[in-house]
Amino acid sequence: RLRIGILLSKYSEYQVDYISSESEIGKLIEEADLIIGAGITAYEGVLRRKPVIVVGDYGLGGLVTPDTFRKHYNNRFRGKINGVRNESFSLENLEKEIYKSFNLTFQELQMMSNQTITLQNI
């Protein structure tokens, strides 16, 4: 949490929240502009049409895009595709992914949300 806070400190309009209980997830995801997380948090973020950067037990998976969505979904949003457990990453790389997230369009977010719903029903 502290590292991300430092990374984003030059942007005073951003508020970084750490979700500590499952009961908070839905409400905070709905209010968020960007989700950084793994597993169900990342999944819910995609489902709710939010930009998602996957950071998990397997390192930095990066921004979920229409091109990477299926790989992240199949990897259960656990981190880097084909990564190793507890893989480290640089804050500079996370920062690059944050900047890339600003370029996702609503149509791209909607398409990934729809794919999530379709895959749920298979």
Regions found by a protein language model. Give the residues of each.
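An anion/phosphate-binding loop that grips the pyrophosphate of nucleotide cofactors and donors
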Residues: 32
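A short acidic, amphipathic alpha-helical/loop segment
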Residues: 4-7, 28, 44, 48-50
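Catalytic binding pocket for nucleotide-activated donors in carbohydrate/polymer assembly enzymes
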Residues: 43-108
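A short N-terminal helical cap/helix-turn-helix that marks the beginning
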Residues: 98-99, 106-122
